[in-house]
A protein has these predicted regions:
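Small beta-barrel nucleic-acid-binding modules, primarily SNase/OB-fold domains
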Residues: 1-172
């Protein structure tokens, strides 16, 4: 649909012949023809070139949302979901009451430190769920390490998660 609208609005605006549906289909085919031979293995993941942004949401102790523009653009401000690299925190939708309780504590502590502030991203990549994966800094403070050192998260290498037994304890 984008290609058709682009042709109609940009390429053909002053040409009566382009207003016919068959001409739009021909133009659309020419624009998208290169896609016919593309497969998944021919493509690369898109890693947004984001270096910093304002924290607008803290989902849990290892996932935040930032607002940022793409560099060198006047364009819109986008929101990006960012997973803190190298850490795992209790899950808000965890399997035990204790894990959910710890997740709220972890989220609230992280939120108190970074919500509404400008953070810087380093070692940016994409993770399997489509989120940005990055080291997050607030000034000189490496937020990821701070969460681990203060007991609100555990180290995580991206493989199998190893939940501490304390997350499974339902006693309060």
């Amino acid at each position: 649909m984008f290609a058709v609208n682009y042709i109609k609005n940009s390429c053909c605006a002053n040409h009566a012949i382009c207003t016919k549906k068959e001409n739009l289909i021909i133009e659309n085919t020419e624009i998208t023809n290169y896609l016919n031979s593309i497969s998944y293995s021919d493509t690369l993941p898109f890693i947004p070139p984001i270096d910093f942004g304002k924290v607008i949401k803290v989902y849990d102790g290892d996932t935040i949302t930032i607002a940022a523009k793409l560099p060198n653009t006047l364009g819109p401000i986008y929101r990006f979901s960012v997973r803190l690299l190298g850490i795992d925190s209790p899950e808000i939708k965890g399997s035990t009451f204790k894990e959910k309780e710890l997740a709220i504590i972890s989220r609230n502590i992280l939120s108190q430190h970074i919500m509404g502030k400008i953070v810087y991203l380093r070692n940016v990549s994409m993770e399997k769920y489509g989120r940005i994966l990055a080291d997050v800094y607030l000034g000189d403070l490496h937020v990821n390490d701070w969460m681990i050192k203060n007991g609100y998260a555990i180290p995580y290498d991206g493989g199998t998660k190893h939940r501490p037994s304390a997350w499974d304890n339902d006693s309060v």
